[in-house]
Amino acid sequence: MKFSKIACATVFALSSQAAIIHHAPEFNMKRDVAPAAPAAPADQAPTVPAPQEFNTAITKRSIIGIIMGILGNIPQVIQIIMSIVKAFKGNKREDIDSVVAGIIADMPFVVRAVDTAMTSVASTKRDGANDDVANAVVRLPEIVARVATGVQQSIENAKRDGVPDVGLNLVANAPRLISNVFDGVSETVQQAKRDGLEDFLDELLQRLPQLITRSAESALKDSQPVKRDAGSVALSNLIKKSIETVGIENAAQIVSERDISSLIEEYFGKA
């Protein structure tokens, strides 16, 4: 597969996650699925369950469940990013740093898409729905700010400790880093339950930057330096080129079956 297509797959992966939540709010809920009913006889018209029946088959999900659902998709995105790096044989530190900077620059658009998605979910009325999602929307800027703080502190600590090629090491050690963060999040949630805390989100927000920083420090300090070739082309330029190659219209057509073309088009329009 050409590098341009692999790079473009990363954009699809990130934008599709937000788009699926936006256009199919039920994906963001934990389903209690009943066994499928037997097929109707040929001479009998199939029955379509009423919306009320469908809604009652979906259990409400707490804010921790939503967060863990989002975190659950991170390894897949990391694998795609790892594939991009492996597919391109030469990577200079400044190339990766440039990509990281580009991701940070695009983050407001991603956050806006997630914000829109969660707002859409919050506005969807269901039996037994509570204010967990609405509260998450209100606090989204705070969540993002705290996570960004943890990531930035991890990078600063790595530079201070003389870790070579911070960007490459972050990518190469991403699975281990994510695993450590998962463990920390799980431990925090369990501790909150033992302590009888009603607002797990508060506890998680307070500890998430420290969890990320601690995990990244360990992964970067113990990692082997990632070698790079001197004559590589900037990954960021290739990613931008891949978007130009595929084009907005083709991107929208590819994902039209999920009815997320409008969001993809909006996202690519900001690229």
Curated annotation (Swiss-Prot):
Residues spanning the signal sequence: 1-18
Entry keyword Transmembrane: yes
Organism lineage: Eukaryota, Fungi, Dikarya, Ascomycota, Saccharomycotina
UniProt-recorded name of the protein: Extent of cell elongation protein 1
Gene Ontology annotations for the cellular component aspect, listed alphabetically: extracellular region; host cell plasma membrane; hyphal cell wall; membrane
Gene Ontology MF annotations: glycosaminoglycan binding; membrane destabilizing activity; toxin activity
Induction summary: Expression is induced by human serum and epithelial cells. Expression is regulated by the transcription factors EFG1, BCR1, TUP1, RFG1, NRG1 and AHR1. Expression is down-regulated by minocycline. Expression is controlled by a very long promoter of at minimum 1500 bp allowing a complex network of transcription factors to contribute to the gene's regulation.
Gene name tied to this protein: ECE1
PTMs per UniProt: Cleavage by KEX2 generates 8 peptides ECE1-I to ECE1-VIII, all terminating in Lys-Arg. Only peptide ECE1-III, called candidalysin, shows toxin activity.
Phenotype when changing R61A: Impairs secretion of candidalysin and subsequent induction of epithelial damage and inflammatory responses in vitro, and leads to attenuated virulence in vivo in a murine model of oropharyngeal candidiasis
Effect of R93A: Impairs secretion of candidalysin and subsequent induction of epithelial damage and inflammatory responses in vitro, and leads to attenuated virulence in vivo in a murine model of oropharyngeal candidiasis
Keywords: Cleavage on pair of basic residues, Host cell membrane, Host membrane, Membrane, Repeat, Secreted, Signal, Toxin, Transmembrane, Transmembrane helix, Virulence
Domain notes: The N-terminal alpha-helix of peptide ECE1-III allows insertion of the toxin into host epithelial cells membranes.
Gene Ontology biological process terms in this record: hemolysis in another organism; response to symbiotic bacterium; symbiont-mediated cytolysis of host cell; symbiont-mediated disruption of host mucosa; symbiont-mediated perturbation of host immune response
